Amino acid sequence: MLIPGLPVAASVLVLPGGTDNSTTPFSRRQPAPMRMYPFTLSLRALPRVVVHQAVYDVHGWNGEHNSPLAPAQAALDRLIDAHPDSPVILVGHSMGGRVAAHLAADKRVAGVLALAPWWQHADWEYIHGEARVLALHGTADQRTYPARTEKGIAQLRERGVDAEFVPIEGGGHAMLDHVWTWQSTSLTFVRSFL
């Protein structure tokens, strides 16, 4: 929530999920972006925090096309241009967690919150060494791989990155269970930058 007369304390870019391969046009009414609305709304309630939810061109990653990266990078650039003095935190679910890892090669990114990230081919290696990283992953996730996320966080820590893995016991991919844990942990992470 922006407070007139006070500077922005943090900028947050929310990155929704998608799927492996799809050229279906992206819609805000698809389940993946709708799943992130509660996070976006909760984050917007934080004082002096600007929140933008990214909109991709198509619904899929699409192999080497890396389809969501260009629109997500453009959204990140706009957010930074509008608020150059505030730390930027990326919040990504599933494919959005993969997008966040790639965008976090940019040293202007202060933090990455990866929610059940779909990390492939060591995507976490893109994250620069000064970023703080928190990854939450449900232990019952059948779509993405909690063990891979935990491995990625361990490798980031070996590089000296401030990174933490939090397993959500019994949690599934859609984050429809343990809602309070997903939400409160996310809010606490973003608040830590204020």
Q: How would you describe each model-predicted region?
A:
Residues G18, A114-H121:
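Active-site nucleophile loop of the alpha/beta-hydrolase fold
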Residues M1-L46:
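Short, surface-exposed "cap/lid" segments of acyl-processing enzymes
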Residues R157-L194:
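C-terminal catalytic histidine-bearing segment of alpha/beta-hydrolase fold enzymes
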Residues V91-G96, A100:
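Gly/Ala-rich beta-loop-alpha elbow adjacent to hydrolase catalytic centers
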Residues Y145-Q155:
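Short alpha-helix in the alpha/beta-hydrolase fold that links the catalytic acid
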Residues N62-A82:
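Alpha/beta-hydrolase active-site loop
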Residues G129, L134-D141:
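Short beta-strand/loop motif that positions the catalytic acidic residue
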